[in-house]
Amino acid sequence: MTISQQAFLRDAMRRLNLTRDVFATRIGVKRRALDTWLLPEGSQEFRAMPEVVQRFVSEIVQNGVLLEKYTQSVQDGPLRERIAVEGKNQLLSVDQFTRESVEDLFRVADMMQPIARRQKVSRVLEGAVLGNLFFEASTRTRVSFGSAFCRLGGSVCDTTGFTFSSMAKGESIYDTSRVMSGYVDAMVIRHPDQGSVAEFARATNIPVVNGGDGPGEHPSQALLDLYTILTEFSRLGKLLDGAHIAMVGDLKYGRTVHSLIKLMALYKNVKFSLVSPQGLEMPSYIIEQASRNGNIIEQKTSLAEGLAGADVIYATRVQKERFANEENEGYTPDFQINRAIIDAYCGPDTIVMHPLPRDSRPGANDLSVDLNHDPRLAIFRQTDNGIPIRMAIFAVLLGVEGLVQHSLPFFIIVLLFITKGCITYIHNDTLFDCRQTVMT
């Protein structure tokens, strides 16, 4: 089975680095027609792309090496080998990625979208077990990783908090990692100490994903954030090259911004406005790394200076659990991002993002709830993208991304659960005879 029409077109636009408007002109169609082709299959306004257009797009992508230096061929080896850590299929830092490998992962995520939306079903990880080892509080990340693994047919074992771990009895990270490796096929680890996830990973050969290591990194969050930005920019007719990104809040301890700015630094001529209270600035070593590719870094202490003209505003929660008492003094209500601030300094196509959770209590120095119904607020579209991105991560690290293309339509799987005996159906113009006895 080929990839979906939506994934095919997104891949073409990314490979050619074109906005929707320019891409539509390039292939000789109206923007409105392209928009209907990019909708999820099954939606009311979805339209099938004519075969002649599909052939034309394929020819452009194959022959039009407009940005060949940005495009990674599959002939260069499997993606998991290109992002491997010391020969191991693990995801510990965004430093493992090039721009090409990021976009290759996003192509896999595009393929996962109909499975994430439950329009199709995949069982490629059936029998595999994920160990979610969270030694620090988490809701979204833990559930998102678990859901992603289950969407591919696997099962999940959860461990949360030090008090429920043998590490509370003095067990070492090394011992814990070695023991868990015998129980599960992959691990996602969150730990309050920077560098601890890498220590877990060194003790095992199974895939390990960094779910957040103290103030260090959060690579899967950065990947889903970048995927969201590129998806929103495609809709708005923008490119990340040359964009203005404002990051606001606790930039010292906020691991999501540490990973995201390094990932976006793979693009060119990006302007980063880093807005934070004094004492909570972005670490200097990250600023130095983000300054490559002609990117501009400006550090600000007020929202008015940092938000003006921003294409993306990325707000972060105050990491009070990592503060020394005196560090909290500089964080005032002046750093609350609300609708009045956005209207005053930003345009109608600014994207407002947040890794969540946000402090929604009245007067909190965070992203205000008065933006909840503002179309510029992308935080829930952002969280929705966590499932396909994390599905893509698991598929790549476990080497099953190619098998996902053989996923069955969701309605056929439903029939298997409600019908006994022999089921015959047609899928992609091929006759299948499924012999499976199902309990009712």
Predicted regions mapped to residue ranges:
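DNA major-groove recognition helix of helix-turn-helix/homeodomain DNA-binding modules
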Residues: 48-68
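Positively charged, low-complexity intrinsically disordered leader regions
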Residues: 78-143
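Phosphate/diphosphate ligand-binding glycine-rich loop within oxidoreductases
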Residues: 123-230, 360
